[in-house]
Amino acid sequence: MKNALSRICYKEIFMKLIHCADIHLDAPLESVFPPEGAREYRRAVLSDFSALVESADRNGADALLIAGDLFDSDNTSERTVRHVLDLFRAHPNLSIFYLAGNHDGGGLTARSDLPGNLHTFGQDWTYFDFGEVMIAGGTAPDPAALSLPPERVNVVLLHGQVRGGGKGSEYSISFSKLKNKNIDYLALGHLHTYREATLDARGIACYSGCLMGRGFDECGRKGYVLLETVNSRVNHTFVPFASRVFHEIPFDVSGYTSCPELESALRKETGNIPKTDFCRLVLKGQVDPECPPDIRQLQTDLAGSFALLRIRDETTLRIDPRDYENDISLKGEFIRRVLASEQDSAEQERIIACGLRALRGEEPEI
């Protein structure tokens, strides 16, 4: 244990712990990325986790708390597992407390070649007396059996979905049963967004969120929680750390009449997003049926601006039936017939948009 696990700072004894979760190493993510993009993403996540361990040790952290789902499945490649174990061995002064989550399986904890600074939790409550901190956790423990000394700083690791009461699944956590158990900090994993809540008069609970988003449903900065114990208190701070971020950018295209003009506006809107990040543009507003945004062309022209680009077209057509009352062209007849059909307005717009593209000689976007 490093420096007797404590340091004197302005006459206050303190320790520094890092809480992370949901790294999901080796996640396939084939539904999000093309094959090469998925491989690049997996390398980036492993690189970020390695950087976190190195940063923790370099900046004087006493321990890294992993609250579940370090790996995405129990079929993680041997190469990735060995990388992680070698990483831990390379930082012997940093204690690693690893709680397996619902994705991890038991492959890692069953190995015989674990480094000496890696500490794991069983199914029931497992306790570690770590300097001024008591660390407890379990993969499926009975909350009623939790016993923590009131005079200590107590940190508990659990993985699952918090529920208010009643019976839940194996990976559900009852807040009510953990109240008044002398918990100072409840380090949670399972949700991929940072959240914090008051546990009781003494303790707080935090989901650290994932270290890097896994799709456009996990946009925004991701990272870890820094814990500092000062005079038997726990201070916590969320620290953004992900090297790559998912962004969703809504953009009103009303009034834009050409693809180059719209492309220029979108480049300006997204100019502050790093090229290594992932971006989804959501186009909104009303557009002239004669010149709707050319999504495929925009996708092609802007693709090199980000590691991954998706464009979602949520625009609606600005159609006034009176404009086509006396139009004797094929286009006018087509629009009148569609507007007179029993289809709902959304389906009518889709049909008209496809039809107009076909009439212009373009490939319809079905």
Regions from the PLM with identified roles:
Residues 12, 231-366:
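Accessory, non-catalytic peripheral segments of nucleic-acid enzymes
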Residues 14-18:
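Extreme N-terminal starter segment of soluble prokaryotic enzymes
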Residues 19-21, 63-69, 95-102, 106-107, ...:
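Active-site neighborhood of phospho(di)ester-bond hydrolases with catalytic His/Asp-centered motifs
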Residues 33-127:
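Core catalytic region of metal-dependent phosphoesterases/phosphodiesterases
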Residues 84, 104-177, 181, 204, ...:
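Conserved catalytic scaffold of divalent metal-dependent phosphoesterases
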Residues 168-233:
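Conserved beta-sheet core of the metallophosphoesterase superfamily
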